[in-house]
Amino acid sequence: MTGADVVAAVQRAVRDVGAGQGLWSPGDRVMVACSGGPDSLCLLHVMRALASDQALEIVVGHVDHQLRPSSRDDAQFVAQVAQRWGLKHRVAQVTVRGTGEAGAREARYEALKGLAEDLGAQAIATAHTADDQAETLIMRWIRGTGVRGLRGIPTRRGVLVRPLLQVGRRQVEAYIEAVGLQAREDPTNAGLEPFRNRIRHQILPLLKAENPLIVEALGRLAENAHAEVEALHHLAVQGASREVLGPDGGVAVRLELGDLPKERGPRMGIFSHRLRWAHERVRRALDGKHGLQGHQLGRNHVLAVEEVLASARGREVRRVSLPGKVVAVVVEAWVSVVPETWLTTPPALEWEVFPGETLAPGGFTFKGWSEEVTGEGQGKKN
């Protein structure tokens, strides 16, 4: 394959995934998160090349983690590339030392969110490749995961989009060489820390020796898992909830559980999907349109709520804290998922009340009655 063939193939892959999965719309401003490394520099070059055809405006965001003495040089390099290509750019500095992988990732995404807002971008494109997807699946499999975890890195989550997920690292390197770009190299990527580096340098090469197409195979696994989870999710939550909107923009969700199967396996599977969906719905309302940080619900959270639900007695109100300042409130056979703040300062809500008692999210009970007025003006309660 010639250099021109490589360039055409990579650009076609990005264009197809962008159009096929609705990663952007004509007229959007897309911020490419560029570290200066091969993957992100490749993505920036591709997006710039496709901008006219896709009717996009490309801008650049760079996050300086301040972990290496050369990090300022990386920021300067990205700024020079953006200026040379006539692209608006912004740089953010974050402090991630001592926060661990999860903390560093959260700080990076929060910084990207701020840069996107500053630049007025509708989407943030990150340069995760097919190899990154494979490494993620291997890492989750080793640590333990379910079908949801096998979905891997999503092509889109909120404003985050990953147009390079169908492109392998070797293709990226060939693209960079073909267009004559010189990328920055992060020396920490060559070591065996963190865990992902050991997967990249030790485990994945062994798997490639057994199956040279292992990266593509794991990519298909992620796509299949995503499709199956989405299908089951749709069936599980359809008509199974009631939402309440608060004046503060928050949302509470009350789950209907009367239709759950009696068998524990199917019951837990459907309940898990409903609870996760409700949690994500409440979190999305709290996070606003960006929703960069998912505060994912783990199996331990689902089991905790299920245990409380199984032992519920009478009108006793019991609560289980969930990630992201969300609470599951259990009353009898009802589970309501509400923002934590609603339990201390309930917002003013409109709620339809019928004669008798009505349960509302948060464990609140409304008592209602109807009154029939006779000709003599005397009321009769029902």
Residue ranges of predicted features:
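Non-catalytic, well-ordered alpha-helical scaffold segments
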Residues: L41, E135-T136, N197, H201, ...
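Short amphipathic alpha-helical segments with heptad-repeat character
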Residues: L204, K208, P212-V215, G219-H226
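Short, surface-exposed loop/turn segments at secondary-structure junctions
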Residues: D186-A190, P212-V215, G291-Q296
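AMP-forming adenylation/ATP pyrophosphatase catalytic core
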Residues: G3-D39, L56-V59, V63, V94, ...
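Core alpha/beta nucleotide-donor-binding catalytic domains of modification enzymes
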Residues: M1-E210, H234
